[in-house]
């Protein structure tokens, strides 16, 4: 896993450290990372990289900064596919079981927290199979529970 994930990490902005990490231990995948709030910015990115409990990465810090600019009181990041890789082309083979758990974690959070809109922060269209499959499945789930996705 180490060779797939950047060593370039950063501190979280003070007061914006995560209090929700699934799974809590650092491993080759991550379903959720964020700081709970009553009005959080919820972003769905491509796939996770290096961010963990004590160290952030560029993408996470950008999302935190957007949440601050929008006066949100929290931030939560999910991904189209949960495998850690700074370069998505280095991910392993698609695993439907991992994807099913990913969808389950996203849906559970959105429903339990009455989230009605998310930021689709997954970047440009990718030709990477697991991201294509992940995007289709995530968008289908969001539609089924009435959550709007904003992306550009």
PLM features per residue range, with description:
Residues 30-36, 55-75, 107:
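Short amphipathic alpha-helices and their capping/turn segments at secondary-structure boundaries
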Residues 85, 91-152:
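Glycine/proline-rich loop-helix segments at beta-alpha junctions forming the active-site rim
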């Amino acid at each position: 896993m180490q060779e797939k994930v950047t060593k370039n990490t950063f501190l979280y902005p003070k007061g914006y450290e995560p209090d929700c990490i699934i799974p809590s231990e650092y491993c080759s995948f991550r379903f959720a990372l964020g700081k709970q709030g009553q009005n959080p910015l919820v972003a769905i990115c491509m796939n996770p990289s290096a961010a963990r409990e004590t160290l952030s990465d560029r993408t996470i810090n950008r999302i935190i900064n957007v949440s601050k600019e929008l006066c949100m009181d929290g931030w939560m990041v999910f991904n189209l596919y949960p495998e850690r890789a700074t370069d998505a082309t280095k991910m392993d083979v698609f695993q439907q079981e991992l994807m099913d758990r990913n969808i389950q974690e996203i849906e559970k959070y959105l429903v339990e927290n009455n989230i009605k809109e998310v930021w689709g922060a997954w970047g440009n269209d990718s030709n990477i199979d697991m991201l294509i499959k992940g995007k289709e499945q995530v968008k289908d789930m969001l539609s089924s529970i009435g959550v709007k996705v904003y992306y550009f």
